Design a protein with these regions (language model features):
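Cross-family detector of peptidyl-prolyl cis-trans isomerase
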Residues: 19-174
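Sec-dependent bacterial lipoprotein signal peptides
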Residues: 1-19
């Protein structure tokens, strides 16, 4: 008799757990709902960051343009050299600041940075901005986090989801 009671009790508990599991799965969003929720949340973050950048540009009186990707740029000194093409080796002097104004990185005056345009290895926003330049140009780029180091930052000086400001001089192209 005790075995029967225990068996019935175990079956009842299993039934309750199984029913509870079904209700939980019904309440969980499907992949499409989850994707839509995450996209909406990400869009809110992007919109907030965009407004912060817009306010900063106005506060500083910078005459900047926003690209379709969200890069803000201003070429404040025009050079006379040739325009950058994908595949060129860009030689630049640069400084990077956070939106707070804190300078966090800069090129060595005796050793400019070199990178091949279009091959990665630098921030997406920097590559986009460099493609708008000519040799001798000096420019300011504001990279929202999705064009800079994204959610993780760089793990050293650039914090998570940070907007960064590049001041760049295109020294030469190879």
């Amino acid at each position: 008799m005790a075995v029967t009671r225990i068996s019935i009790l175990i079956l009842l508990l299993l039934f309750l757990v199984a029913c509870r599991h079904e209700r939980q799965t019904e309440q969980q969003p499907n992949d499409k709902q989850l994707r839509e929720y995450l996209e909406a949340a990400n869009q809110l973050l992007i919109d907030g960051e965009r407004q912060e950048i817009k306010d900063m540009v106005e506060r500083h009186g910078w005459n900047m343009v926003e690209s379709p990707t969200g890069l803000w740029f201003q070429i404040y000194e025009k050079g006379a050299g040739r325009k950058v093409n994908r595949g060129d080796i860009a030689i630049i002097h640069y400084s990077i600041s956070l939106a707070t104004g804190d300078k966090i990185y800069a090129s060595n005056p005796n050793e400019p940075k070199q990178f091949q345009v279009g091959r990665g290895g630098v921030e997406t926003g920097l590559e986009e901005g460099i493609l708008m330049m000519r040799i001798g140009d000096k420019a300011r780029f504001i990279l929202p986090s999705h064009l800079a180091h994204g959610v993780p930052g760089d793990g050293v000086r650039i914090p998570t989801r940070a907007t960064i400001i590049y001041n760049v001089e295109l020294v030469d192209l190879l």
